[in-house]
Amino acid sequence: MNKYPIDDIKAPAYLFIGGEVLFMKENIKVQKVSTRLDVPTSHNIKAGDILTDQAITIKGSPVAFSNSNVLFDALAFVKGQRLPKIDNCYIVARVASGKWVKWSFAPAIHDTIGSITFGANLPMGEHGWTVYPNPLKPNEPLVKVEETTAPVVSNLEDAGKFMLRVLGKYGDELAFDTDGANIDISISTEDAQNDRLIKYGKTLSDITVSAKFKPRNISLDDWELLTGITSAEEIGTFTGVNTCEDLVLQGAKKGDFMFTLKSARCKDPSDTFSPKDALMDELTFDAMGDNFGDNKLVIGTVAEDFQFADESAQ
């Protein structure tokens, strides 16, 4: 490959995960991270160090994708499950006119799912993948580099679908509008290590899902019912993980994305009595999941155009 002044290289790139293509906002960040243990002599002088673990992280905020499943696959995993390694992960980048390079990674683990924001210019937060060495083949590189040709990119779906009008439903009775919403997703993991303490993967500890929004086009009575702020609750009462209503946030048109927070409960609701501010503050709902505390967020598509009950009656 020809040499170029490193400062002059600008490298627009595509990320392929499991063969599916992702186009990231602004950049794709690849970082090699290592942990080393100092080895001192008897005089407490550092003689060197030992490499104890190493990994490569890949991070970026998707703006377009060929298949949304590659972004939300981890939502279906259950606690205690080993996060699967995904083959066929690589970056194809243009480093000069007509010059493309391909970085092929060892199998990667999807361990970070970014937030989903409706009604903003940044619809999706940062996703992350981690590449670990294979303990059975410790000499294999984590990434291989080669020259290649321009990638063949299929039709991409714009993440702007998440920027559409967001409607909400809670249970079977309550339907309301919003002025935008945000869904935060956090994955907690534990390192998987062999008997020589070499990290080779991750085990899922838990997934937490919460949604924030301000309801609109809702009556005061329905808002009080939605938040539970005026409901009487007895101290010491047990509430099972799958006993609350489901919260649905969805687009208004058929085919739009629909996000279902399983057994969602309003967390610390508040209101503001003021001559200047709206009574209805932003609400936060936490998903508790199914009977085992799993499957907290289910993603689908809207089957038909949404209509409020009073609209359909007109």
Spans of model-derived segments:
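Short, acidic/charged, Gly/Pro-enriched secondary-structure junctions
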Residues: 72-102, 229-257
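Solvent-exposed edge beta-strands and adjacent loop segments
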Residues: 1-70, 101-126, 152-223, 263-281
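Charged, amphipathic alpha-helical segments
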Residues: 1, 61-82, 138-150, 216-237
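Short Gly/Pro-enriched loop/turn and capping motifs at secondary-structure junctions
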Residues: 98, 254-256, 266-268, 290-292
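Residues on the solvent-exposed faces and adjacent turns
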Residues: 32, 95, 133, 185-187, ...
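Short, tandemly repeated low-complexity microdomains enriched for cysteine and small residues
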Residues: 28, 71-76, 102-108, 140-147, ...
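Protruding loop/beta-arch "assembly-hinge" segments enriched in small, turn-prone residues
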Residues: 130-154, 279-314
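Short, loop-centered acidic/histidine patches that primarily coordinate divalent metals
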Residues: 106, 132, 252, 262-264, ...
